[in-house]
């Protein structure tokens, strides 16, 4: 009975907040944003590509963390690399793998006489892929590590993954296909062709393989203001895991923070043409106000245009010795926090031509 009463209270707060904060009818899935409001987190916006979606990113923001996977390959980009540094790095790595011996995990003292490197090849000019194994076993066929490098326009893309022994003979064709798709680009240049955007590049072409991306943006470097966007292929089971199932865990996290929290808004909305759920928390502890906004869209397994999408906006943090209250509190008030959230979510959309 207590849970039922709590649910009624939460729903009542949600309805009141919906009417007071947005002025929209209860059936609407989008939230209007008041134009012309001076918000330091939204001073200038530019189109930004993320996976096969895009949104209007604040120019003053900085990426604090990022991760990309395509076809099971982790993609890591290093910028401003010279051709000489690329050649030296690849040559040193190949020499290391040709010199190093595989070990027997059962008898580490055994001299197996087999070098770690199994294969080395160049799918495209200025690239090198290594297939190797640090161990050898007589009873089972161990998977191989793969490590690849692609260099263009002072940009170095490194790929890492695993490949089964049963597809070892197809390694060249697999990497020929993937590496020929990779094109380097300026990060602010949004491609018009189909493809998957990652740091400094795009894997061109329609999607036939798994794709995953995570980017964290420091909206005001030096202050606790973080936007986190995570995209991956949608699967059928995602439809059974709505955001409401995670409310208990979210509440538990907030309960471990000082102060008292309240729900500003909770319910369904649209994002990038997909059905989604959101829950927006505010936590106040004296002079410190913290906002924790969450959105989850399960996506559509039938199309990569609607990936499983998770968005978090984290404004403010509990005060501590090295973070006084005036620096720990959210850099914007409640109206400003809602404006940031709705502006960025409303701008998240499928990139034209991405599919």
Placement of each model-derived feature along the sequence:
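Bacterial N-terminal signal peptides that target proteins for export
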Residues: 4-18
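Bacterial N-terminal signal peptides
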Residues: 17-26
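Boundary at the C-terminal end of the N-terminal hydrophobic targeting segment
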Residues: 30-32
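Surface-exposed amphipathic alpha-helical segments
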Residues: 61, 159-197, 311-355
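Long, acidic/polar, low-complexity amphipathic helices and coiled-coil-like
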Residues: 62, 66-199
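A short acidic-to-branched-hydrophobic micro-motif
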Residues: 64-112, 158-163, 213-250, 278, ...
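Signature of long, low-cysteine stretches enriched in small and polar/charged residues
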Residues: 97-150, 238-305
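Acidic, serine/threonine- and glycine-rich low-complexity intrinsically disordered segments
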Residues: 165-275
